[in-house]
Amino acid sequence: MLFRGSPKERRNFLDINLSKQFPIYLDYISRYEKVLRQRNEILKSEKVDQKLLEASTELLVKYAGPIINYRAMFVKDINDILIKITRTLTGVKEKIEITYRPFVNMSSDYQKEALEAFKRSLDNDLRHKATSIGIHREDISVSLNGKDIGTFGSQGENRLVALALKLSPYFMITDEDKKPIVVLDDVMSELDKDHREQLIKFLRKFAQVFITDTKLEIDGATRIELTKSN
């Protein structure tokens, strides 16, 4: 499940959706990951080259800044959408909030604060021969009525809110010439009858929706069957 799984799953959710909206974001991620690999190789050296380590750290800080800004903007924009979708699917006015936790807060002194954070983590990095902080270790969380849903939410609540979160980016497409195509893989089996009906009703807002399922029947939908051949 999204909120009970690895933080990497949640970072992937951010990165995939931001890359679709902003191609330059993918460029920043690619540059950051390249420098991260280089820094980790330096840390694994028998004799660490301090100048190379310093240079790679400065580059990580440089590329991390725009990534943090994009992630923070995305989470802020998606929060109200997440609330509306969750309430539509559940029919209950729960208090929902998505939170992004950057490795360092953006401010006018971002570069200085980020470099200081890397300096504080240096002993740990050298000991484990890997970069222990940065945008590659960040996470997002969702709270339901003030409590972390991954920790305190029921299995049903986790499934519904995760589904609502996955649907939210489709509502961020404001260009009328771009009609989003919604693709949902085997989500119906995780929902009870009432919530399946609510979801199907909700999905009729979209021009095209593809749902994979082994036995789902939807009025007015075109069914494409795939069979396994011997």
Each model region followed by its residue ranges:
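H-loop/switch region of ABC-family ATPase nucleotide-binding domains
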Residues: 212-215
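Secondary-structure edge/capping motif, primarily at the C-terminal ends of alpha-helices
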Residues: 43-47
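Conserved NTPase motor "head" modules and their coupling/switch loops across ABC/AAA+ ATPases, GTPases
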Residues: 51-181, 190, 194, 198-206, ...
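Conserved beta-strand scaffold positions in the cores of enzyme catalytic domains, especially
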Residues: 209, 221-225
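Walker B catalytic acidic pair
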Residues: 185-187
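Extended, charged alpha-helical "arm/stalk" segments used for dimerization and assembly
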Residues: 1-42
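Generic alpha-helical segment signature
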Residues: 7, 32, 49, 53-56
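Alpha-helical structural elements of signaling/regulatory helical domains
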Residues: 23-27, 48, 70-73
